[in-house]
């Protein structure tokens, strides 16, 4: 596979290989058959990052081969959304003749939405000045005149210049309801929108008929907690990154949801608060004891859950665990299976043609 050529004819084979690998990993835990969710075979990534290569008068996007570290020119990128592909060529063509915009530009990051909005972040190895901003505003206006609903951002060491705003608002149809999600530049968002919708709908399905409240750790911009709010009386969610918390608060208001409370703190600190180990100022006014959380939702980083958090989640009757790394999920399951059994298992092909797997498990307390 090269960046410009996806092995589309191998899509079914690679998905079957992942399914078999997941079954093998899950075999010690008497898991049910995985529910398998397919990705679009191309144009599935809503984000992409490219280095920029300068060769005399030429300038183009590049990526590096993961094995050989060789430089690969990328003029089209079928893994990314069609909108990203269109902007890639238009942006390079517009920047190339402009020395002020070209000089020491080393990377471009793209973030697009299904709703037709896109952010391009231009990263430089130099300080950006008023002259750069004037040229960037002209560039933005020219590209908007070509039909791009574009936000343009300049970045350099300890510098960030927003010409307008640093976010786009995405709209995802989730189980019959349009959900609005503010996505902030340089913050985590799910890269594969089609699979994100399927993950949200699967999470809704497995929590249908839930009793009590939901606790979520690592909630990001509220991706799961807002979609799941309709299945629970109340949702209490934690997130450490400030921009993500701000986006989550906006998303709560935009979706007119009144039963979600977001707390800005690390999952490890929240574990201490729940266990009564110590008190935190940012929890003032929130009565944790008033929540009746029968279900806990976790979507941890690749490293999985730390030992203390694993112990904490074992106290809940139901655990919904979304994992971007089945190996660390299995390490956590070694402990979780002592108290819980897996009732649902899903494979989400977020990253086709790579070894990466996203999966979900619903664990229910053993009687």
Swiss-Prot record:
Q: Name one GO cellular component term.
A: cytosol
Superkingdom of origin organism: Bacteria
Q: Where is the active site?
A: 324, 358
Q: What biological-process terms (Gene Ontology) are attached? A: tRNA methylation
Entry's EC annotation:
2.1.1.-, 2.1.1.35
Q: Per UniProt, where does S-adenosyl-L-methionine bind?
A: 190, 218, 223, 239, 299
Record key words, sorted:
Methyltransferase, S-adenosyl-L-methionine, Transferase, tRNA processing
- What InterPro entries does the record point to? MeTrfase_TrmA_AS, MeTrfase_TrmA_CS, SAM-dependent_MTases_sf, TrmA_MeTrfase, U5_MeTrfase_fam
Signal is among the record's keywords: no
Q: Name the catalysed reactions.
A: uridine(54) in tRNA + S-adenosyl-L-methionine = 5-methyluridine(54) in tRNA + S-adenosyl-L-homocysteine + H(+); uridine(341) in tmRNA + S-adenosyl-L-methionine = 5-methyluridine(341) in tmRNA + S-adenosyl-L-homocysteine + H(+)
| Family affiliation | Belongs to the class I-like SAM-binding methyltransferase superfamily. RNA M5U methyltransferase family. TrmA subfamily.
Explain the purpose of this protein.
Dual-specificity methyltransferase that catalyzes the formation of 5-methyluridine at position 54 (m5U54) in all tRNAs, and that of position 341 (m5U341) in tmRNA (transfer-mRNA).
Q: Matching PANTHER family, A to Z?
A: TRNA/TMRNA (URACIL-C(5))-METHYLTRANSFERASE, TRNA_TMRNA (URACIL-C(5))-METHYLTRANSFERASE
Name the record gives this protein: tRNA/tmRNA (uracil-C(5))-methyltransferase
């Amino acid at each position: 596979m090269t960046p410009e050529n996806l092995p589309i004819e191998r899509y079914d084979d690679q998905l079957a290989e992942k399914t078999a690998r997941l079954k093998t990993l899950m075999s010690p835990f008497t898991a049910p058959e995985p529910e398998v969710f397919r990705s679009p075979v191309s144009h599935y990534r809503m984000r992409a990052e490219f280095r920029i290569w300068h060769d005399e008068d030429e300038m183009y996007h590049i990526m590096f081969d993961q094995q050989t570290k060789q430089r690969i020119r990328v003029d089209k990128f079928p893994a990314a959304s069609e909108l990203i592909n269109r902007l890639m060529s238009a942006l390079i063509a517009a920047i190339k003749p402009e020395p002020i915009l070209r000089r020491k530009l080393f990377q471009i990051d793209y973030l697009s939405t299904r709703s037709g909005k896109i952010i391009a972040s231009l990263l430089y190895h130099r300080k950006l000045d008023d002259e750069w901003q004037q040229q960037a505003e002209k560039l933005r206006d020219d590209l908007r005149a070509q039909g791009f609903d574009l936000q343009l951002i300049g970045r350099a060491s300890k510098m960030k210049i927003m010409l307008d705003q640093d976010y786009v608002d995405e709209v995802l149809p989730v189980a019959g309801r349009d959900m609005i999600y503010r996505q902030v530049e340089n913050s985590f968002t799910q890269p594969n929108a089609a699979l994100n919708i399927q993950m949200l709908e699967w999470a809704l399905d497995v929590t249908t008929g839930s009793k009590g409240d939901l606790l979520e750790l690592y909630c990001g911009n509220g991706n799961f907690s807002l979609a799941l709010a309709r299945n629970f009386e109340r949702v209490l969610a934690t997130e450490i990154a400030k921009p993500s918390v701000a986006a989550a608060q906006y998303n709560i208001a935009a979706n007119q949801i009144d039963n979600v409370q977001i707390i800005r703190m690390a999952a490890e600190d929240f574990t201490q608060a729940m266990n009564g180990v110590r008190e935190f100022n940012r929890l003032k006014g929130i009565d944790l004891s008033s929540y009746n959380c029968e279900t806990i939702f976790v979507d941890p980083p690749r490293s999985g859950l730390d030992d203390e958090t694993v112990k904490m989640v074992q106290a809940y009757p139901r655990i919904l665990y979304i994992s971007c790394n089945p190996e660390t999920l299995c390490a956590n399951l070694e402990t979780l299976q002592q108290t819980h059994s897996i009732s649902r298992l899903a494979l989400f092909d977020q990253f086709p043609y790579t070894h990466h797997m996203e999966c979900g498990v619903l664990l229910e307390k053993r009687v």
